[in-house]
Design a protein with these regions (language model features):
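The conserved Walker
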Residues: 61, 126-127
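Short beta-strand elements
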Residues: 8-18, 54-60, 150-151
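Short hydrophobic/aromatic beta-strand immediately N-terminal to the Walker A/P-loop
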Residues: 120-121
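P-loop NTPase motor-domain active sites and their immediate coupling elements
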Residues: 21, 33, 43, 64-98, ...
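Hydrophobic positions on the alpha1 helix immediately C-terminal to the Walker A/P-loop
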Residues: 133, 137
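Conserved lysine of the Walker
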Residues: 130
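N-terminal anchoring/assembly modules that precede and organize ATP-driven motor systems
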Residues: 1-27, 33
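P-loop NTPase switch/communication element
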Residues: 115, 142-180, 184-185
Length: 242
């Protein structure tokens, strides 16, 4: 149907199809003499022909001489965490704290590295998958890192999402569910952060990786990750303290 819909703009061919979980991307190579603008301006017409809510056209793609046509799938595909874990992108990741983030529009696994961020805000509407994404990131790190490499401080005032991790050896402290205790724990972790900055300064290094290379094995520092579920709610209750 897509080929038929494109036929009236001139000759060309679809050279690649990349199915993703949400959309399928088609690379269309216009024949000589066909203007790219003719294809790019066809979004609404293609959506009507394909009976789709919308069609996104991106082009031209540098170095390929093609235009990408992104068509929403009739049903969104499920992306399983295991698929990302067994992928080459995750298995061969050089990141110290790899995050399995999902798949891109072409169905290729997307893996991030928390140490390269190092702050991360997950935002979205209710029911959009924020908690699922957060749990996937935590599991990604737990999958690869031992307690000697990474430790967590988990703050969960609503007691709904992070309590499942209670008792794992990676915790700096029991999962925090009280807002007052959360403020205390955050002040504590900030104090510890200042101590670490002084330790890095003493060794004349810029990060934990550099510090761990400069000291003996028994003196190495683990990464510390603070995870706060529903940060906005915590700030409303304890705005001054947080």
């Amino acid at each position: 149907r897509l080929a038929n819909a494109l036929a009236h703009v001139g000759e060309g061919r679809i050279v690649q199809v990349s199915p993703g979980p949400i959309i399928t991307s088609y690379e269309f190579e216009p024949a000589a003499g066909v203007k790219v603008s003719q294809v790019v301006n066809l979004g609404d017409d293609l959506a009507l022909a394909l009976k789709s809510a919308s069609v996104r056209i991106v082009g031209p793609i540098p170095g390929r001489g093609t235009v990408a046509i992104e068509v929403p799938n009739a049903e969104a595909g499920m992306v399983y965490l295991r698929e990302i874990f067994v992928s080459a992108e995750f298995a061969e990741s050089k990141g110290r704290l790899p995050l399995a983030l999902g798949k891109d529009v072409n169905g290729v696994p997307v893996v991030g590295d928390l140490t390269a961020m190092p702050h991360l805000l997950v935002a979205g509407a209710t029911g959009s998958g924020k908690s699922v994404g957060l749990n996937a990131m935590i599991c990604s790190i737990l999958y690869k890192a031992t307690p000697a490499v990474v430790r967590f401080l988990l703050i969960d005032p609503k007691r709904l999402e992070l309590s499942v991790y209670e008792g794992i050896p990676h915790l700096l402290a029991p999962v925090v569910t009280d807002t007052k205790e959360a403020s205390t724990r955050l002040r504590w972790i900030v104090g510890k952060m200042d101590e670490r900055y002084k330790a890095l300064q003493a060794k004349q290094v810029r990060n934990i990786e550099g510090y761990n290379k400069a000291v003996a094995a028994e003196e190495r520092l683990p990464y510390w990750i603070v995870v706060v579920d529903e940060l906005a709610d915590l700030m409303m209750v304890s705005a001054g303290a947080v």
